[in-house]
Amino acid sequence: MQIFTIFFYALAAECPVERFSEIYYNDRRKGMRLMTKDIKMLAIDLDGTLLHDDMSISPFTADILKKAWTKGIRIVFATGRMFCSARVKLLPLQLGDIPVVCYTGAWTARLESQQVISQDGISPELAGEILAFVRDREWKVQTFINDYAYMAQPDPLEQEYSQYRIRKTIYTGEDFYHPAETVTRMIIVEKNLQKRDNIRKFLEDRFQDRISIVYPERIFIDIHKAGVSKANAIGVLAARWRIRSEQIAAFGNTENDISMLRYAGHSFAVANAEPVAKEAADKTIGSNNEDGVAHAIATILKL
């Protein structure tokens, strides 16, 4: 009890009461009501969260983000997209050379300069094993290396990912199955959700703790190096800025957002989010088409 009391008063001395936010909400993870400190960092997913269904960002959302950035709030967009694809959507916001977490945490780079901050991909050896396993079962797979997409040969299923890509896929034939470089990510597309779940189980049973798998969208199976997640990538940036998890607000809508929703001290799922994301979040806000993220930020930061 004495140790806890000392810690509490030390924290209070560092962060006076008047600096605490007036926002209250029910934290399901702790089963208690919390008073939240001023938010210093926003971690925001793109597709289905910030972006409208037509892939646009509303003027209202752009204005709120600009106000938050001007106020000194650190803004990090965390997406499953390729960096080049995310960059096209985010440059018009004019938020400076901010970090963008891409490939669900496997690649972080600066928005304007394109400087790569970190990469955490699948080794060529492991990638070769996975591709051989996938090939034997005739599953359709795409790899991403140095922000370019690769396939063995053209396939109609490739079009399912085309809306998230601005660079043409590179077809390499037999060489595709023998990568010479680190693979940032692999994607398998499967429209049949039962088959999708079976594929995931086969992969997890075969490769176990050597890979990490998430569903960024209903028909996509993302394969990453074990340990890759949005939370880990965001945590690295937060540590550099000396920002604690309780000072972060995160916004998401799908399974690949769960890690950061659980990591952030304050987490929000949009109304259109999948049930697993809503369960992981502290609160549900307006949908992506209703600018739910922007309205929540405006309330939290009193913009």
Question: Predicted segments — roles?
Answer:
Residues 59-158:
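Active-site phosphate-binding/coordination module
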Residues 61, 86-90, 199, 203, ...:
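Hydrophobic packing residues within well-ordered alpha-helices of enzyme cores
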Residues 129, 133, 137-251, 255, ...:
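Conserved acidic, metal-coordinating active-site core of Asp-based
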